[in-house]
Swiss-Prot record:
Glycans are attached at residues 96, 102, 472, 483, 613. It comes from the Eukaryota. Pfam families: DPPIV_N, Peptidase_S9. InterPro entries: AB_hydrolase_fold, Peptidase_S9_cat, Peptidase_S9B_N, Serine_Prot_S9B/DPPIV. The chain crosses the membrane at residues 66-86. One of its GO terms (biological process) is proteolysis. GO terms for molecular function: aminopeptidase activity; dipeptidyl-peptidase activity; serine-type peptidase activity. One of its GO terms (cellular component) is fungal-type vacuole membrane. This is Putative dipeptidyl aminopeptidase C14C4.15c.
Amino acid sequence: MNAYEGDTLNNHGKSSTRQHWRKRSAVSSSLEFSSYEESNSPIENTEVLKVSEIEAKKRRRKKHRYIYLAVCLFFLASVLSCAIIFRFYLHTNRENFSLFKNDSYKQKEPITVSHFGESIFLPYHQDIEWITSTEGTVLYYDQSTFSLSLFYPDGKEYGSNVDSLITSFVLTCKNLHRKRYSSDMEYIAFSCSKDRRWRHSYYEDVYLVERATGRIEHLASDQSKKIVVAEWSPIGHKLVYGLGSNLFIWESFSEPPVCITDQSDLDGLFNGNSDWVYEEEILQSSKAVWWSPDGNCLSYLSIDDSKVPVHVLPFEQLDSKVEDQNRVNNFFHYSTPKDPIPFVKLFVNCFTDSGESIEVDSSFPLSTQHRYITDVAWAGNEKLMFVEVLRGNYERVTSLFDLSSRKTTIENTEVSEHPLALTSSLHLKYLSFESLGNLKERYVRQYFLSNKKRIAIYELDNPVPIYLTPVNISFLSDLYLINNTLYFTAISSGSPFSRVYRLCTKSLILSEINIQIGSGLFGIKVSNDQNYLLVNYLGPEIPKQFIYSIHEDKVSTSNDHSKNNLPSDSSSTSLGKVKLELCNSLETNEELIITKEKFAFPSVFFKVIKVKNITAYIQEIRPPNFNPRKRYPTVFHLYGAPQSALVTGKYEMDINELMASVYNFLVIKVDIVDISDVSGQHLFSDSHELIIKSWIELLRSYVDTPYIDRHRVGIWGWSFGGYLTLKILENADFIKTGAVVAPVTDWRYYDAYYSENLLGAYSKQTTAIYDKTAVHYSENFRKLCGLLVLHGTSDDNVHIENTMQLTKAMVEKGVYNYYPFIVPNANHEFSDPTDYTFLREKLSGHFHHALYC
């Protein structure tokens, strides 16, 4: 019986010893064969042999199974590993594959560093001014061109073109600053910039052109003297201008100018124009003259800096033969917190009277040496309103001067134990209208409450303000008052973008003017008849300019407060509706739109975040083909000064955009808009440490964003932003590198008005505060992959002493990764094209290297 036949079957008819594979052929040895023959029990020997062979085969099969299983597992593991590696490579390099590429960037040209020096990414902008003809026609003109043309709102030219009258003059005025028509349109004043005075002003050559004849004459009889201020009267063509220390009134070519101050030209005496601190911090303009509405009177400030120390810039003209129009005065009067401040007086001169200037009495007769005059506004033609602030900003008084009685009365007094909210101009505006047969006099100004700028209205006999804007709207800029109607731009809570509003101060109807352009930053100018609105769309998309006609929907409201007392709060304000109709697409920047389609621009993303008690606006400038699954080296850009905004939505192609588009960085602008534990009235004196900690906590939290490479984080700032950057680097340990431009390092080196508004008047009681808020050495500086500091020797705002003191401290501590870079002749803005190009490339290049050190 063969092996198969000898198998036993179980009850199911299946062999209990049957194998599931075929047997191998076996060749027996002679020894095995002889043993088999000699066996007394052949069947028994055969069975033993079978069992032995089966066990051996089982062991071999088991061993083979392990080998096969190991090979299979190894193969599967290899395939899986390759798949994972390929998937990761595909994920991190998806922008290199056409399948995953963003179509909007597919054929676009990459941006290089050199492109930023060619101005091809900059928009065009027209400097439009409204004017009304003698017959009442609303017109406009561009202040930045030589053309004498005037235009209707729809863009059609008004009258005949007379540009040929000034063909030769164009060669005389090589650098036009601006042109201004007289209110009767008979004369044009051309201001030709010659030498820069300070940040906001130039010494100018002013030429007058008679529009009817083309006659051109230089305004100053002594052309060696430069003019700082030249302002037309609101009626007719009187022109006030400042020459040396005196003010003059020009009225016609046939009559000589009249001097209304008649003082000797003295260094440090400013009549009708600002000294340094008034220009930079208070009026934010070189102009310190105000015409009455009828043009018959003029008010002006007289500023005496004779007791204010002279600051000398470490200026070194490398080539005296080269004329530098961006050069500032190399010496000027400048008060720090330890110094006397300017002595200021307010005068009124009415040409219909004796012609003598009348000094306006101060509301602080015993403290005139320690006061600033921050606002001046005419209340009709017979009264003058003005605001005075005591040094340190602990007391602010609004007063009214009556020309007929020559008396000053106090209308409102604000007093605080701490400095009041930091402000320059309050945008003081006078209101008057008939109510129940009586003349109701009021005034409007901005008011700071809970870290927001609100618009408030006051009655002259009531010091309690009424807020005209809701608490969720913070006044921004462009405040126009026309016939008791206010036009302004503001931002609402939860968005960094501006909106345009109109507010009737008589009926208290607040209207949002809906502009069908998109969200972003807006600037406005309103025509004198309120029928036309110039809208400047400033970003984030390509800037544009439009002129609209204004139409109002009639709104039924019982909220007419002209016959009653004012409401207790703006909650009573009604909402009106305003329609706009497009008249003229003034500037669309089509060339820039085409350029943007050609090049791979960075993208911009805005959001609002909250970290514990901190609310902040964020603007991310993302590199082309931004991939949220990747991690990007990141640079934070900060400013952080009180009542300022960095995140505005303005279109820019500058340092941040260079780093994003050329070096593939993520650049993030940050504004903290609210810290619930910090008083909105004051920034530093009580809570400076908490504020710095809040900035650090916010940044530390944000670097955990998935697409930020937390090991490659940098930070930079300019001016106040430079100070904030240094304080963060002093106290934070998670930032790899930093860069600052013109930083404040100690508020005792900065101007008294700003510093004392932050920290209080300098005294024995406040010395500790000034010490604490200064920048101090920290071991965190030593751990950085480089700290770059850029400062110009001709910086009239933040003096180079700030950087010198910081450098001294770093040298004493042996901090070798500190890189100060002093730029000869550069001013605070690095406004010279060569200086700014160097700054842009040096700063961006620093981060390009330092974030990978």
